[in-house]
Amino acid sequence: MKTESSGTEPEGASRSVGIVETKYMTIAEPPQALKLESGESIGPVTLAYETYGALDPDRSNAILVLHALSGDAHAAGYHQEAEAPGWWDAMIGPGKPFDTDRYFVICSNVIGGCKGSTGPSSTNPWTAKPYALEFPFVTIADMVSAQRHLIDVMGIDRLLCVAGGSMGGMQALQWVASYPERVRSAIPIATALKHSPQQIAFNEVSRQSIMADPAWRNGNYYGIGQPERGLAVARMIGHITFMSDQSMEEKFSRRLKKERFSFNFDANFEVEGYLHYRGANFVKRFDANSYLYITKAMDYFDLSGGRLINDRKVDTRFLVISFKSDWLYPAYQSQEIVRQLKQKQVDATYCELKSTYGHDAFLVELEGQTTLIHHFLEKTYRGERNGNGYRR
Amino acid sequence: MDIVANGIRPDHQLIFNMVEPGARVLDLGCGTGDLLHFLEANKDARVQGIELDERAIYECVRKGLSVCQNDIESGLAEYPDGSFDYVILNQSLQEIRKVYFILREALRVGSRVIVGFPNFAYVKARMALFFGGKAPMTPSLPYHWYDTPNVRFLSISDFQEFCIEKGFAVEKASFLCGQKRITLWPNLRAMGAIFLLSWREGQKGWSDDRFSHRWRSRR
């Protein structure tokens, strides 16, 4: 008879992983190359990544955390001299759901990105100039295949978990579709099997905004200055879609920056100021061409129609999470994932969490996610350790 | 509901007794997952829950259970035929509008269905109605008329008749009054009942059903 060991609650005693550093690994060096879904190939490919915690001697406690559109490898802890922690610091660290006292957590920047991994702003070794639009189109499957090389080099046969929100969730799903035998569990959060026309439309407006900026110059702006206005507008659109009507009301209402209207087109409302601020900040840290490539990769992504779970026996456990006020990735899209899992009799847990934060909830709505992820991982970990995997 | 000395609800104990070791079990409306957890731990069952309440789902996941958030009426549609050995529908039958549809669906995805419900014809309920002239309130029907989630008010005899009419075979039936098993005159003396159902030979009433057609064409 089994008895349930009551796990320690993550709340209360959680700490930061402290000072961390981004590392780099180069794969697909000539004569090798990374074969891409489009038929093209690319190499060498550099991947920026960070790790937190220690890998077990039997390498069974590795968790791959996957970032969203504008994220990077810096998921937790602090960079030297930096004020802000990594993008998922609330969830990764000692005593946190991704407990680095127990698990080895890896996060890598996607290919096509601009945060240290090879992307359109990287130097093309054949021309010694930035790739710009010479950069081949990459898909979510390509991002995942690059990550698989990283995991291979680390000597990890099977990941305890792949987890991420939004585009990170797409990558988690793609991991199961591409390499089901290499993932023990998956946590796709606020994500979808495919973009709806509405989601594609928002991305297309963002892309058009970048490409309509004369400073874009067909992508050849490196060394001159990137299309900041276009990229800023693209990001503003993004931020509108990340919030809910209610969260915007709570955050800004119709409050003014100054006491009265200026009767010109300056930012009068706080919400305008916020969007401007977000846009202006974003152009300092993100490459416009990367934005084009990555949004396209998200639009191309499609694991609907039974492609998530192929005919191989899949014993990956799933924890699927959506948020009530998320209208960019509505709950019905997560429910569609769950439907696929039920049809293929894959072990699944699904919960739609109450939140008013919209799509942003996956980064800020912590309570429910903390409880669910902590216990889900604990069960997965125990199952793996006891060698009594889930029979099908 | 009372809890007996070994920490398990008497209705859960009866359901537990009906389940074969190592079975695949789906609990519709599994609440905080006590029954599933007990089955997993002590019958080596492969269990899955469906539950609507977010807080209850947290409790299930805390116990290491897999649960999908869904209402009972739409939670079964995606499961292929014969996904489970048992589908449990305990203490929620009386809250369901499409009773026959759910039971048929449950017998599509599972080989057997275990149904537990409160008995509306329990003697104290009859007395409340007959002598008091008031809508009955009993330990198994604890709600006022104005806040009850129940939409179906059935007795054990009603359900037995329903099973005969719809082609369900009653493999087992157990009756409870508090912690006590009732064998004599259950429709009068029992507060609740647990039925183990399967299709009567040659019935499988769902084959002509438009819902399962929809499901099958999707596969």
Where are these regions (language model features)?
Chain B
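Class I SAM-dependent methyltransferase SAM/SAH-binding core
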Residues: F38-G75
